[in-house]
Amino acid sequence: MIIDFHTHTFPEKIAERTIDILESNTEKVQGVRSKAHTDATVAGLLKSMDECGVDISVVMPIATNTKQSSTINRVAQETNSRDRLFSFGSLHPMQEDWEKTLYDIKEKGLLGIKLHPEYQQFYIDSPESVRILKKCEELGLLVTLHTGLDIGVFPPVHCMPERLRRVLDYECSGKNMIAAHMGGWRAWDDVEKYLV
């Protein structure tokens, strides 16, 4: 069985526009436009899965502002009713009802949350982040973190391996945390130094 554990989809009405923005951002930051592998719709993901022999995909939505989480988590729950797809939930670390949102995510049967410190503009070792990480650990929710650089975002980088190490040493066990991109995209020496 082949499982793609880190995928992204968007509602059909915004998918094309969102992909254009993300691709454009990579061109601004990297000087080269990085093309998406699918059209970012659920149908596009399923088609890609069929073409590549992927049995199951896990979708990682990202709440990029404090007002999106209820819609994102409702769509995530709907995604989980489909064959072959599982979706995490999301919340924004600065939203006031973060704790209630985590309980809602748990109640909806979602496996965990996706946090993207670059898109959400928070440091992984900030108090706002740590309180969420601790609560997720308490609730038994997985946390997938974007770690290291993002090809479409200018520095500073908000989740470098050294910052994640501080969280693991002083705040959380990390047993429920998944550091995407091998612990720090394009920060491989720091991954080896702080996380291996």
Identify the role of each PLM range.
Residues 111-112, 125-196:
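Catalytic pocket-lining loop regions of alpha/beta-barrel enzymes
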